[in-house]
């Protein structure tokens, strides 16, 4: 895995763990973990989206805000790498 992708994945994992902790959810999170399966609510997903935007200094386009893109750390990593690569934000 490329260094940029590893860095993005680590940062996303950190943000996800922070949101889970704030929502009193104790779970072991891995890149393929389905966030809804570990207990993240729809409000938690909104909080996660806002924190991801802040962490990566991005404004996610409406078309990227989909359940598929926030399904797992790996899915968010792909979306963020695409956004960083496109120069959007």
Curated annotation (Swiss-Prot):
The modification O-(pantetheine 4'-phosphoryl)serine is found at residue 42. One of its GO terms (molecular function) is acyl binding. GO terms for cellular component: cytosol; membrane. 4'-phosphopantetheine is transferred from CoA to a specific serine of the apo-form of this carrier protein. It comes from the Bacteria. GO terms for biological process: lipid A biosynthetic process. The keyword Cell membrane does not apply. Residues 6-84 form the Carrier domain. PROSITE patterns: CARRIER. Keywords: Phosphopantetheine, Phosphoprotein. Aminoacyl carrier protein. Can be charged with L-glycine via the formation of a thioester bond between the amino acid and the 4'-phosphopantetheinyl prosthetic group, catalyzed by the bll6282 ligase. This is Aminoacyl carrier protein 2. It comes from Bradyrhizobium diazoefficiens (strain JCM 10833 / BCRC 13528 / IAM 13628 / NBRC 14792 / USDA 110).
């Amino acid at each position: 895995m490329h260094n940029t992708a590893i860095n993005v994945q680590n940062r996303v994992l950190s943000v996800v763990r922070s949101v889970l902790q704030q929502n009193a959810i104790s779970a072991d999170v891995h890149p393929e973990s389905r966030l809804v399966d570990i207990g993240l609510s729809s409000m938690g997903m909104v909080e996660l989206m806002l924190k991801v935007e802040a962490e990566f200094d991005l404004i996610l386009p409406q078309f990227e805000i989909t359940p598929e893109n926030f399904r797992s750390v790996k899915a968010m990593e792909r979306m963020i790498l695409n956004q960083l690569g496109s120069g959007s934000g």
